[in-house]
From Swiss-Prot:
Positions bound to substrate: H67, F68, R69, N99, H325, F339, G340
Active site positions: D321
Disulfide bonds: none
Protein name: Dihydroorotase
PANTHER family membership: ALLANTOINASE
Cofactor, how bound (note): Binds 2 Zn(2+) ions per subunit.
Species per Swiss-Prot/TrEMBL record: Chlorobaculum tepidum (strain ATCC 49652 / DSM 12025 / NBRC 103806 / TLS)
Cross-referenced InterPro entries: Amidohydro-rel, DHOase, DHOase/Allantoinase_Hydrolase, Dihydroorotase_CS, Metal-dep_hydrolase_composite, Metal_Hydrolase
Pathway in which this enzyme or protein is active: Pyrimidine metabolism; UMP biosynthesis via de novo pathway; (S)-dihydroorotate from bicarbonate: step 3/3
Gene name tied to this protein: pyrC
SUPFAM superfamilies given in the database record: Composite domain of metallo-dependent hydrolases, Metallo-dependent hydrolases
Alphabetized UniProt keyword annotations: Hydrolase, Metal-binding, Pyrimidine biosynthesis, Zinc
Lineage: Bacteria, Pseudomonadati, Chlorobiota, Chlorobiia, Chlorobiales
UniProt GO BP: 'de novo' UMP biosynthetic process; purine nucleobase catabolic process
């Protein structure tokens, strides 16, 4: 049975498309026809016709930074429940970080994820570890990753501390055209820290994490990349592609902005919790465990710098760093809480509420940040609204107002600081892999 979406706002930044129109999809999942500019697509009696007047059809959202905990910590999340969380948030694909148990640092680990994700409603891209067991001591087999069509490497959560190992990672990743995703953290500065270092941490009696721990690592990496580009590469290998995960400070944004101006292939992402919350939200909350994450929630000034980075295009993507934890790991004193929160179900709503509605970015730019750019950065195929192309769509109601509640989550975990928060904008469903899934 074919599916016919009528009267939707067709919004696809990759095609500079923003107009009211209709899309018909065959039962094979391929787009049969696209109508805009007052044109119409005739419906057949057997078609599944859905009127989307006032709603948006966008390219399927893609989150390039998620943790689904499988293998090894299935009590927090599984590939199946993580995928359910993604669908609830309007995502048709995500990229999975390798810090599972065991770490995904070999083709065997990649094969495990692909085998166990077969039949799930979304696409799962596997990110390989930068180093063996993410210990920062010896490089993982980048050549074998490439042969398994892995697109990126990261030691997320345990940034490479050795400059020599990082230099090798940059060179080898460039040779195999792998994106380097850096969790920028100087562990010598952050050891034992719980939240942003400053007056608020002192007031709460919690050990602080100095904000300089992030830009120090970014500056080191960018210096290495610039040096290798000038003195070592000489066209012998591809230029490194470097991506900063969950950027959180003004200085980090400034470094990325400067590197882009210098012509380096540098991109970065920000999480909804970092452009929405600050350290003061932690201090005023009773349930502080759900405000503990890395990098920590920072000052108002740093949060505002992130918003400006989104406004001027320095920040390329919005990613959730979806990090599920069990109830007992978060409902505890803050200095005992696990780092991280879930984010797939609330990402779109926070983006529209905090950025689009406040005039920081347009809805089209939001789709770029949530879909077009993450796919481009990861080296994935661009989604186009054209006949013959595979339909990969997210259905959005940008005006829907809703209160975040437990019933909204597909995730196995509930560790969010946004429970009870009023948001505007919500995914109503997805069309992907020849299947329509509506909320």
């Amino acid at each position: 049975m074919s599916t016919l979406f009528l009267n939707a706002r067709l919004l696809n930044p990759a095609e500079n498309l923003d107009t009211v129109g209709s899309i018909k999809i065959g039962d094979d999942g391929l787009i049969e026809a696209v109508a805009t500019g007052g044109e119409s697509i005739p419906a057949k009696a057997e078609d599944n016709v859905i009127d989307l007047a006032g709603k948006v059809l966008a390219p399927g959202l893609f989150d390039m930074h998620c943790h689904f905990r499988e293998p090894g910590q299935e009590y927090k999340e599984t590939l199946e429940t993580g995928s359910a969380a993604a669908v609830a948030g309007g995502f048709t694909g995500v990229a999975l970080m390798p810090n599972t148990r065991p770490v995904i640092d070999s083709p065997l680990g990649v094969a495990y994820i692909r085998h166990h994700s077969a039949g799930l409603p979304i696409d799962l891209e596997v990110i390989g570890a930068m180093t063996v067991e993410s210990r920062g001591e010896a490089l993982a087999p980048y050549g074998k990753y490439a042969s398994y069509s892995v697109k990126a490497v990261s030691d997320d959560g345990t940034a490479i501390q050795s400059s020599q190992i990082m230099r090798l990672a940059i060179e080898y990743a460039a040779n195999f055209d792998l994106l380097l995703i850096q969790h920028a953290e100087d562990k010598h500065l952050t050891a034992g820290g719980i939240m942003n270092d400053g007056a608020v941490s002192a007031m709460l009696g919690l050990k602080g994490i100095p904000e300089v721990a992030e830009p120090i690592m970014i500056a080191r990496d960018l210096q290495l990349i610039a040096w290798l580009k000038k003195h070592k590469l000489n066209g012998a290998v591809a230029e490194p592609r470097y991506h900063v995960a969950h950027i959180s400070t003004a200085e980090s944004v400034a470094l990325v902005r400067k590197a882009k101006a210098a012509g380096l292939k540098v991109t970065c992402e920000v999480t909804p919790h970092h452009f929405t919350l600050t350290e003061h939200d932690l201090s005023s909350s009773i349930e502080k465990g759900n405000f503990i994450m890395k990098p920590p929630l920072a000052s108002v000034e740093n949060r505002d710098a992130l918003i400006e980075g989104l406004r001027d295009g320095t920040i390329d993507a919005i990613a959730t760093d979806h990090a599920p934890h069990a109830k007992h790991e978060k409902e505890c004193p803050p200095d005992q809480a696990a780092f991280g929160i879930i984010g797939l179900e609330t990402s779109l709503g926070l983006t529209i509420t905090e950025l689009v509605d406040k005039g920081v970015i347009t809805l089209s730019q939001a789709i770029e940040l949530l879909s077009t750019n993450p796919r481009r950065i990861m080296g994935l195929e661009t989604i186009l609204f054209r006949a013959g192309r595979k339909a990969n769509l997210t259905i959005i109601d940008p005006d829907c107002e809703w209160i975040v509640s437990e019933s909204d989550f597909g995730s196995k975990s509930r560790n969010t600081p946004f429970m009870g928060r009023k948001l505007k904008g919500r995914a109503l469903g997805i069309y992907h892999n020849s299947k329509l899934i509506m909320r």
